[in-house]
Regions:
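P-loop NTP-binding core
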Residues: 1-212
Length: 212
């Protein structure tokens, strides 16, 4: 089997050994498998366990953006991602419990910034699975705008059938349905993130997670 994130964190493979090319020439990935769930347990007794990923990714400087996709929980793996990242992109479903979890997540990020990674900042809050036809989605959007306007991105990812179908075909939305409304929304997001990062000359290491 091909090696991935688990082997990288366990010190069994280098970044070069686990990096894979994709159909998109400028996009490379480091895959993960179900065995990554075991890494959390194995890292518990490791010295400086919250910085294992940072050490593993040392020397990566040929990429403009490094995006770490995190699970919707604040466990040790997510903490490792926070320790190595310059900024955090927070995707938030337009649902009630996600709104509740957002305040808790932002408080946690402040603690991480204070104790582990002083360079960490919030890149923005991204509203996802938005359906303007529902009252709840509109209410959640209004609440985020009211209380977290400094962080709220202009880009919004709508609820879209093509976006839902793409993973089952093993393709990113740009290859599966590049002219769909869902694809257009991600293009706008990419433009917004690039525009916001132009003043930062460092290689950009961001992570995504979930507010709830």
């Amino acid at each position: 089997d091909a090696k991935g994130v688990y082997e990288l964190l366990m010190g069994e493979a280098s970044v070069e050994e686990v990096t894979c090319s994709t159909e998109i020439e400028t996009l490379k990935i480091i895959p993960s498998r179900v065995d990554l769930t075991g890494a959390e347990i194995e890292l518990v007794n490791r010295e400086s366990r919250e910085k294992v990923m940072k050490q593993a990714l040392t020397g990566i400087d040929e990429y403009e953006f490094v995006i770490i996709d995190c699970p919707p929980s604040l466990g040790l793996l997510t903490l490792n991602a926070l320790a190595v990242s310059n900024s955090v992109l927070i995707p938030m479903q337009c649902e009630y419990y996600a709104l509740q979890g957002l305040s808790h997540l932002l408080k946690t990020l402040k603690l991480v910034k204070k104790s582990i990674n002083p360079d960490l900042k919030v890149e923005g809050i991204l509203l996802t699975m938005f359906d303007g036809r529902t009252l709840l989605a509109t209410q959640v959007k209004d609440q985020v705008q009211k209380y977290f306007s400094d962080f709220l991105l202009k880009s919004i990812i709508p609820r879209n059938v093509r976006l839902s179908e793409a993973p089952s075909h093993g393709k990113p939305i740009m290859l599966y349905a590049g002219r769909s409304r869902g694809a257009d929304s991600y293009v706008e997001l990419a433009k917004e993130i690039i525009s916001r990062s132009k003043s930062d000359v460092r290689p950009k290491t961001s992570l995504t997670g979930s507010a709830a």
